[in-house]
Amino acid sequence: MPTLNQLIRHGREEKRRTDRTRALDKCPQKLGACPRVSTRTPKKPNSAPRKIAKVRLSNRHDIFAHIPGEGHNSQEHSQVLIRGGRVKDSPGVKSHCIRGVKDLMGIPGRRSGRSKYGAEKPKSI
């Protein structure tokens, strides 16, 4: 613990908050290309394989991004748009791919939560 004299001379140092999405450079989204698309097993107690893409962003950062939803058409050299948001059971995955933008298709036939998965409005009968 500092003495009163030390506090008068130097003061207290403010704690710096760590930036969770440093790769995005304070942008809401970033564009990138996928050098690799794979699956990864999550932490205990979960077990379903998570679809993961390694993405080289336009600012030369390499990150892992989660591909949400059921099924995807992403492959090597696909262009994807990235947003923040971690995947709780996958260590090191701190961002998501945005469906329905660039080469990553939306989910066809999805009715609920369409805006999150880039799905088109279904035709009314």
Swiss-Prot record:
Q: Please name the Pfam families in this protein's record.
A: Ribosom_S12_S23
GO biological process assignments: translation
Q: Quote the protein name from its UniProt record.
A: Small ribosomal subunit protein uS12m
Gene Ontology cellular-component terms for this entry are: mitochondrion; small ribosomal subunit
Mark the transmembrane ranges: none
State what this protein does.
Protein S12 is involved in the translation initiation step.
By sequence similarity, the record places it as follows: Belongs to the universal ribosomal protein uS12 family.
Location in the cell reads: Mitochondrion
Region annotation Disordered: where it falls in the sequence? 1-23, 104-125
Q: Which CDD domains does the annotation name?
A: Ribosomal_S12
Leader sequence segment: none
Q: Which GO terms describe its molecular function?
A: structural constituent of ribosome
Spell out the Basic and acidic residues composition-biased ranges. Answer: 10-23
- The entry's keywords: Mitochondrion, Ribonucleoprotein, Ribosomal protein
Q: Which domain of life is it from?
A: Eukaryota
